Amino acid sequence: MAPNDPKKAVGGGGSGFFASLASSISNLGSAMTKSVNGLVPYEGLEVINPEGSTDDAEEEASRGRWKQEDRDGYWKMMQKYIGSDVTSMVTLPVIIFEPMTMLQKMAELMEYSHLLDMADKTEDPYLRMVYASSWAISVYYAFQRTWKPFNPILGETYEMANYNGVNFISEQVSHHPPMSAGHAENEHFTYDCTSKLKTKFLGNSIDVYPVGRTRVTLKRDGVVLDLVPPLTKVHNLIFGRTWVDSPGEMIMTNQTTGDKVVLYFQPCGWFGSGRYEVDGYVYNASEEPKILMTGKWNESMSYQPCDGEGEPLPGTELKEVWKLADVPKDDKYQYTHFAHKINSFDTAPKKLLPSDSRLRPDRYALEMGDMSKSGYEKSSMEERQRAEKRTREEKGQAFTPKWFDVTEEVTATPWGDLEVYQFNGKYSEHRAAADNSEDNTDPKSIQFNPWQFQDLST
């Protein structure tokens, strides 16, 4: 029987390539259900230590970025939201933010875009899936950051021009619910994404459901790849050291041929066992395994051809397909070098849109270490956004994105239905005209302006 379910392949007995990993699966629940006792005022809250140490519970719970008085006050405020989707209903303090927006974070997928180039170039249909799925995994090093990116203002954008041959544009297309759309392109592929995060607040943790649709089109053969990622769990939001895990399946399907990749992100077990590990297979349209894949989402991925039982083919060996690039040491926000480039004006195009995330005053103030100013600017923009909403309602007007159009397509995801936005091509026309312009305005001098109504009094 072919191991169509990678979880079965991992835990299915003493044989099989992934059998040696079964011990980490058998410990599932030890760390994920371990509750550190001793929090008398906060009964029922879990403080999960991924290292599984026997530290004193109260000492462990006191770790993290919060001061005790801030922690107590925030917990009192948040109790009423337990079980709720808090994506946009809660105003959060700047102390938990990183100097980046969700639109910029979408662009981090482009760091290892050369893997999509390789997927387009190869003639091997299964190796194509290895390259493409490794690209999808590569961003998880960035996703482990425990700082929250800023929610984009409605109409906000982020653009990155010709970085390693890739042009990228994203736009906040809806505020309630918060939705972003992104498009990237080079000579080998196009990337299109509609994202609507859904959350569930659980007290000291939060589940983040990636309600969205991600499609990659490889240009040489017109192959369309569809990606469904696993959910993400953020542990120890208020008490303890915050950490992130993404247990579950990632599925990438070749909608043209029916081939697919099923990769299992193992949950963090006792003393950190299993954390970061990813295992699975590339299957053909008949669900027969063709290539096994294994690695860690924060380090590297490798692959090896396999037989119909998922066993490595004789005479073959594991080959590394992706490896994490060097990262800065002791970076406050765990940024990669690429993340710093995303935040910089070095990757900004000529005639940068005034709605660009780089220009946000709250983001920039936080980057400069001025939390007081960042908090003030954040509150001011949120109030301006509320005022714009009231004005639209009074005028009977709906917000219309500039670079993406809403379609009639509603796609089903494991976590709910999603309205799909598509790139309308107008940005390509704008960018071509801007690049041919003689305007050499310093982008740093541009004032942030995503607003629909320019003379609005808040």
Swiss-Prot record:
SUPFAM superfamilies: Oxysterol-binding protein-like. Residues 375-396 have a biased composition (Basic and acidic residues). One of its GO terms (molecular function) is lipid binding. Residues 443-458 have a biased composition (Polar residues). Keywords: Lipid transport, Lipid-binding, Transport. PROSITE patterns: OSBP (PS01013). Gene3D superfamilies: 2.40.160.120, 3.30.70.3490. Expressed in roots, leaves, stems and flowers. InterPro entries: OSBP_sf, Oxysterol-bd, Oxysterol-bd_CS. The keyword Ion transport does not apply. Residues 47-66, 370-401, 431-458 are annotated as: Disordered. Signal peptide: none annotated. GO terms for biological process: lipid transport. May be involved in the transport of sterols. Belongs to the OSBP family. This is Oxysterol-binding protein-related protein 3B. The lineage of its organism: Eukaryota, Viridiplantae, Streptophyta, Embryophyta, Tracheophyta. The gene is ORP3B.
